[in-house]
Amino acid sequence: MEGTDPVNKKLAAALSGGAVLVLALSGCSDDSNDKLNSWAKQVCDKVQPQAKKIESANAAIQKETSDNSAPADVQKTDSKAFQDMSDAYKAIGDAVDKAGAPNVDGGEKKQQDAVKELDKISTSYADLKKQVDKLDTDDQAKFAEGLKGIAGSLDKLSQSGSDALKNLEEGDVGKAMAKQESCKSASATPSGS
């Protein structure tokens, strides 16, 4: 399936960039603010399984990419992966929302901005799922062209929208999150590094 292979590789590369958003929910350093530590634990405990879900979805797409799979198989894998990512980002947004504002200056705005951003990312992945579901798997050229468009959208998605998350996790919030075991394991790579 030579026509779709380069596009699949672009798709996989763009997905890897998107996963960085979730895995960035870990900071570095320490702090003694009990309320903030409690908030960080609540969020990190919810983020960990979602980060694993996103990592698994990325791995599935990358595996399908390296297999030279048939268009129908690529479509099925991508569709499920996009749905999983949509669900995961929505769950992370819900976790940040339910945790309330972190106990820092401007915490409420940071929290609200992050929730909006996570919901937007979730919706974007749901839209990508709809797009991939509509692709014509019987016509390899049309399928490759459709995948190329999806890869372009995915690339834009992976490059945009991380400002609110970065803003949420900066300073004391990032320090508190860095101390949480669940955030440490959520940011670990599959190789254990």
Which residues fall in each region the model found?
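C-terminal motif of bacterial Sec signal peptides marking the signal peptidase cleavage site
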Residues: 23-27
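Short, charged, amphipathic alpha-helical segments
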Residues: 37, 41, 72-83, 108-115, ...
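Immediate post-signal-peptide N-terminus of mature secreted/exported proteins
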Residues: 30-84, 185-192
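Extracellularly exposed regions in secreted/surface proteins, prominently low-complexity, repeat-rich
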Residues: 33-51, 141-193
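Short, solvent-exposed, charged loop/turn and helix-capping segments
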Residues: 90-115, 128-140
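Long amphipathic alpha-helices with heptad-repeat character
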Residues: 47-54, 58-61, 82-85, 118-121, ...
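Bacterial N-terminal signal peptides that target proteins for export
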Residues: 2-16
